[in-house]
Amino acid sequence: MDGNHTIWIEKYRPRRLDEMVGQKDIVVRLQSYVKTGNLPHLLFTGSAGIGKTTAAVALAREFFGDSWQTNFREMNASDERGIDVVRNQIKEFARTSPLAGATFKILFLDEADALTTDAQAALRRTMETYARTCRFILSCNYSSKIIDPIQSRCAIYRFRPLDREAVIEETRRIAAAEGLTVTEGALDAIVYVASGDMRKAINALQGAAILRTDIDEETIFEITATARPEEIDELLDLSIGGRFDEAEQALLELTHVRGIAPNELINQCYRALVQRDIDRTLKVKLIDALGETDFRLSEGASSDIQMEALLARFVLAAEQHR
């Protein structure tokens, strides 16, 4: 096993569209562009780790063959968000002629929603001016942050989180290739940790493989610093049940002893609450409290104070509801 020396998300990244996991409808539509030999500007939208970058690179490989690297450029808009990156780097690539007999080049702009409004306006003009020599594939997490003039000039593809079967199938394939034994419990843990993000799933598997070749669920939760679903359920039960002191101890165990990040706990609590069968009014109050805490943490508030305050809000909301 050479897994310790390579990054698996690159080692096992699909090279062709038909090798992609999930997104079958999108793959079929992208393949149709290859067959016709023409490509509009594209906008890929969806959460991280679900195949947007892979689809763009695979599309370039199929359009350009061996010369794909000379006619394809990948940029990340979050590195430089301002208008200068559009006026200089993007425009410079777009204006030059394609090579090796290609009829156009492809510029893949990841995290395009990080661009400022002015930068997006400049990008729109560049897309129009150089449409003959360059096609743009924009990738974003939130299409609402892309200005309408750009959206109207693109074919929009909404990528969905990978389902359980797709994550398990790909995890098993990689585990077999690396000579790993993965228990069913570990597969369930990977599905839970990944939450539809194949990049997370592969990173979790590689992280566990560094420790051992026989991988169980305990290894997955440990290596990813993730609470077990039952631990989240216990935290919710204690706080909703009014047992603040016990909930506080459970929280400290997860954050201070296990080192689980507060924002990760908030995300896990949210996922658990959405699935929980409780009164709708109480559920709304609890999710609202999670959102408030998440916002305050993003603003730089003390994580210890905010997480304890969250438990207090849970306790009070449940008491008021009784």
Swiss-Prot record:
Record organism: Methanoculleus marisnigri (strain ATCC 35101 / DSM 1498 / JR1)
Subunit structure: Heteromultimer composed of small subunits (RfcS) and large subunits (RfcL).
MF term (GO), any: DNA binding
Lineage: superkingdom: Archaea
Gene: rfcS
Pfam families (UniProt xref): AAA, Rep_fac_C
Gene3D superfamilies with a match to the protein in the record: 1.10.8.60, 1.20.272.10, P-loop containing nucleotide triphosphate hydrolases (3.40.50.300)
Binding residue positions for ATP: 46-53
Single GO biological process annotation from the record: DNA repair
Listed name of the protein: Replication factor C small subunit
GO cellular component, one term: DNA replication factor C complex
UniProt keyword terms in alphabetical order: ATP-binding, DNA replication, Nucleotide-binding
SMART domains in the cross-refs: AAA
